[in-house]
Amino acid sequence: MSVMPDHWIKERALKDGMISPFVDHKEGTGVLSYGLSSYGYDARLDNKFKIFANTHSVVVDPKNFSQDSFVDREGDFCIIPPNSFMLAKTVEYFNIPRDVMVVCVGKSTYARCGIVVNVTPLEPGWSGYVTLEFSNTSPLPVKVYAFEGACQFLFFSGKERCSKSYDEAGGKYMGQSDVTLPIIS
């Protein structure tokens, strides 16, 4: 399994609808860069945010998750409080082919401000808008920007197709259209 180059990503994005909308170049003048890079794709952050807030003194329980754990915000940016957490989604819709596995990494600009981006792998056969998890590890508030680069996706092509894809397995996060909270099925 190898990380795939720009021309391969572009071909699969256009031919298979792997990324939509697809920006076939790196856009970075005056913004956090996004679009196609040499061995990845920098996705953009949408403008709807869910910020962890302890307004109701709830315990975060992944088996019994409460919407009360979050405050919803919408706008051109979001300020993540110190040592806090925020959920958002990508502008781009991903449709992962059956022979591809995708891993997400953070952007160095945000990392240097104390932001860690975490996304579990996009499995073969998965499709939807990606829910992004941002942790502010700094002791200061950090601003993140909507419609600008938020993370980079790396694409790995398997030597052969998997026996059972995410969609065939009935994956619980299949077809996400908005920020999706934890689901226990």
From Swiss-Prot:
Which keywords does this chain's UniProt record carry? Hydrolase, Nucleotide metabolism, Nucleotide-binding
* The enzyme's E.C. designation: 3.5.4.13
Q: Where is the active site?
A: 133 (proton donor/acceptor)
What Gene3D superfamilies does the entry give? 2.70.40.10
Top-level taxon of the source organism: Bacteria
One GO process term, biological-process aspect: dUTP biosynthetic process
GO MF annotation terms: dCTP deaminase activity; nucleotide binding
Q: Where does dCTP bind?
A: 107-112, 131-133, 152, 166, 176
Q: Which reaction does it catalyse?
A: dCTP + H2O + H(+) = dUTP + NH4(+)
Q: Which Pfam families match?
A: DCD
* Entry similarity comment: Belongs to the dCTP deaminase family.
Its function, per the record, reads: Catalyzes the deamination of dCTP to dUTP.
State the protein's name: dCTP deaminase
Which gene is transcribed and translated to give this protein?
Answer: dcd
